[in-house]
Amino acid sequence: MSFRLSERSRARMRGVHPALVGVIEAAILITPVDFMVTEGLRTPALQACLVRAGASRTLNSRHITGHAVDVAAMVEGAIRWDRPLYPRIAEAITTAAKIKGVVLVWGGDWPRLRDGPHFELDRRVFP
């Protein structure tokens, strides 16, 4: 089954690095689990607010530079946060990245505070 990005997801990627946008656009065509983009570019003020609220742990987020997106799984039109859905989405996104020659980091692979919805361009390649 092939899914497509909603206009809302596309709008949320405004200001995101074109390489990452291209990966997400390719991944939606091959993912076994539908997803939407929940967030892309953030202002430093919003990031500081998220840190104060405990929703983020860093003021140095890749969202601030447009090098990260967060996604949410969609099942029958509803957002789902079930952990088993996110490795399936990640497989599609990382496959699309490899095809496009883009080096990504998936938050679900982090040793501390795993963040399954988070994908960012690798700092070593995209400073």
Model-derived segments and spans:
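Active-site acidic/histidine clusters and adjacent loop/turn architecture
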Residues: 1-36
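Short linear motifs at secondary-structure transitions and domain/linker junctions
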Residues: 10-14, 44-50, 94
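Extended, low-complexity, intrinsically disordered C-terminal regulatory tails
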Residues: 25-53, 99, 104-107
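Catalytic cores and adjacent binding grooves of peptidoglycan-active enzymes
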Residues: 57-127
